[in-house]
């Protein structure tokens, strides 16, 4: 009894001391503890082995700053936790992207983190909250999430993010872009397939899938893309399974070879990834640059996707629009091998596109064939 009373008095004294100092008792750290990892097969990044909701239930929230302890004593410190890739190109973040099965440790348009950090299937990482809400202003500025319900969009075409790419000297009815006509995770595949058939698409650059993942889609009960499958069976769909690191030499080599394959096939050509947004956006920017389009034309094409998915325009969300538009500036600087502060208006986009394809391994004759396929 005396021992219990002494413990109570000690606890009361401790609380009194904290109250007298105007301080609270130390908070329990918000952390995952050591947690397993999974390889993100699409992009080669590190998934945490829990769902986004389960991660948030631990006390994390979008806009927080976190520290990530990795194997071998490596760490990513003070990085943002966002619901999208709202960091500069090449910067690290923890991302709980809507529709992803797990939070992912990634570099925005950067090297795959699984290989970068030498991860193995039995590896563990630890994520710890560093500062609550440190990046909340950026999270609030972007804070984009779209619906997968057709009824929430004005038309089937907007829902499918399907459109003809236009600008510069690009020939009419030559190049199209869309959400995936085969991967139905967002419920858009059948719509994109229907528009591809109506446009008379004869060749497809599938930037996101491998042969194996595609076969998996065709076995699903909801697969309803007969036209796309007929193109695939005829050898007219190129499965590229590319990540999003468009600055990498391997990306340039794979893409350049694919564009030459496009040039020697019958068009029109459809370019797509999953959403038809990021990888597709870069590829279309490159093809428009090769077709003598202006930076404004390339930007306008890219931003249609954000109007389609999120309703983001210059008029509806000007600050968000401008922040997203900066992605195109980085595309064009990459294509032209320009520095991060180079004025986009000073870049020769066509010559930059030619040099990019040379870096990717194409000869001048092959590059001319790609340009001839595209332009009037």
Predicted regions and their residues:
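Long, compositionally biased stretches
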Residues: 25-107, 113-128
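Positively charged n-region of N-terminal signal peptides that target proteins for export
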Residues: 1-8
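Ser/Thr-glycine-rich phosphate-binding loops at phosphate-binding pockets of nucleotides
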Residues: 275, 279-280
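Sec-dependent signal peptide cleavage junction
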Residues: 15-26
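Cys-dependent protein tyrosine phosphatase-like superfamily
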Residues: 23-24, 102, 109-111, 115-269, ...
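Active-site cradle of extracellular carbohydrate-active enzymes
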Residues: 270-274
